[in-house]
């Protein structure tokens, strides 16, 4: 499959939920892993008047589920639904290498700081251990890496944790259990049962003797690894617990939940708990700010917020339950907040105290492909409607907060063009998928006059294939090595542009910043690059290895996709009393032929009339039973109306619907 994303050249704002956070306390950089497939880097110490955005790290093509900073903040490891683990230069923001060991979504990472070891796990039930120093030393020539694997998990893994010394690794899964291994030997230590739903979050104590778990069952549990049992159950949430953060001494847990609430609780005395804040959406991840006076939180929404943190020695003043709410007159430490006493900004009553907010962008939630199969309307999470040109890979117009359904009705045409692409909104940006299986990307043949009116030349009406034109535009900068076939005499075969000099198409170009993704039918990512990067030597060689033949046929060999033929019958309407209504004329034509061509056929071949412009008529009409009076009337019509277009002289009906109702450029398939 080939897919591409319609987006801006630089996307400075998350366009969907944010799955994970990492803070570099040395330089104050905050890393956020987005469901829009982009990792962004922010200055977490910015003031409200400064732009927090630093850069984007782009190489994934699906949700980034987890990230870990390692090597003192020099490198970052990421895990994604595109089934890959990637190694990044965190400071410069480029991808150093890609690990393709997993066979399904990679959901979680764990990091042993003292050993510089990272573990990855996901829906394929596998856990792989990676030596970070080995990963960061990989090059184009030195690209072989060995890994240890931990087996035994019977279900998909959603959470993973290690202690800094790397003596314990814990996984949580849809088995509703915690499995514990020694990563040094890959031997199983224990299996802990107690949760009733998926285990979504884990934290291991520094000494490796305890682990805290959060589950979709809404419970937080403290486990003793030595005793292999649960020693505390905390119930402060009404829905699943998806994020956990521990204080340095492992005495208090900060939990984020599907119920949108973030709560701090003392592990040994759960009655000492306080509601830090209530977010706008279910909480996905948590991390401390640079001085640990607040916590950064992410949710299903695209904003990243920092909330004022309570002091642990004041927790005994509170007793929070899932039905409690914040006293809107007090700060996070139990004292009143005024503008002179704190920089924190009170949010709406009962919602907590927001210290900072990194604003996100809107995610596209709805789309409708118009009947012309070129344009589509979208509606985003802020209720804004926009129109996109899929063929030219760009947004055409922001329509604002208008009636979405009315815009669809207003812009729909009575025309039929076959489906030739599918749309995926998983990342919050429109991803267009071209393939050869369920939806054939070469199915849409149209006349240039109807499909590309802005490029059609007067007097000519060539037929164009949308999928072919788009693939040629997407790979315009790719110049693969020349083929090894030659004509007799040693002269290179230049036919069909095989020398690579003929690239792109004659009608349009697409934005150079457009990401193109080549993937297997099952969705596994094979190659990702920008349109402009296809000219690079490395990228060109990679494309030569990965681009499927059905793409190279139209892009390089310039093979024309086959026309789709449509059989149909012509039958005289009952109102034509003198016409032989029992006789049908069976015809076959390309499905994209315009119905005015059928009118011309009827006028010339069936009725024997002249075409506009002096074209001679046939003396034997397709009707076959014309009598002399009919011929006389046709002769009169010829002399008086030979300059009138055929579609104005012939009325075509299909299922009793007049073709005039659809416009003069209606196609036969419509």
Swiss-Prot record:
Known SUPFAM superfamilies for this protein?
A: WD40 repeat-like
Q: Which PROSITE patterns match?
A: WD_REPEATS_1, WD_REPEATS_2, WD_REPEATS_REGION
Q: Where is the composition biased (Gly residues)?
A: 613-625
Q: Where is the composition biased (Low complexity)?
A: 338-348, 626-635
One molecular function GO term is: ubiquitin binding
Which of UniProt's keywords are assigned here? Repeat, Ubl conjugation pathway, WD repeat
What GO biological process term is on the record, naming one? double-strand break repair via homologous recombination
Region (Disordered) residue spans: 321-348, 613-645
The residue spans of each WD repeat are 13-52, 59-98, 101-140, 152-191, 194-233, 236-275, 278-317, 359-398
Q: InterPro entries in the record, alphabetically?
A: G-protein_beta_WD-40_rep, WD40/YVTN_repeat-like_dom_sf, WD40_repeat_CS, WD40_repeat_dom_sf, WD40_rpt, WDR48, WDR48/Bun107
Q: Does the keyword Repeat apply?
A: yes
Give the multimer and partner information.
Catalytic component of the Usp12-46 deubiquitylase complex consisting of Usp12-46, Wdr20 and Uaf1; regulatory subunit that, together wtih Wdr20, stabilizes Usp12-46. The Usp12-46 deubiquitylase complex associates with arr/arrow; the interaction leads to deubiquitination and stabilization of arr/arrow.
> What biological function has been recorded for the protein in this entry?
Regulatory component of the Usp12-46 deubiquitylase complex. activates deubiquitination by increasing the catalytic turnover without increasing the affinity of deubiquitinating enzymes for the substrate. The complex deubiquitylates the wg/wingless-signaling receptor arr/arrow, which stabilizes the receptor and increases its concentration at the cell surface; this enhances the sensitivity of cells to wg/wingless-signal stimulation.
Family note: Belongs to the WD repeat WDR48 family.
Q: What is this protein called?
A: WD repeat-containing protein 48 homolog
Native source species: Culex quinquefasciatus
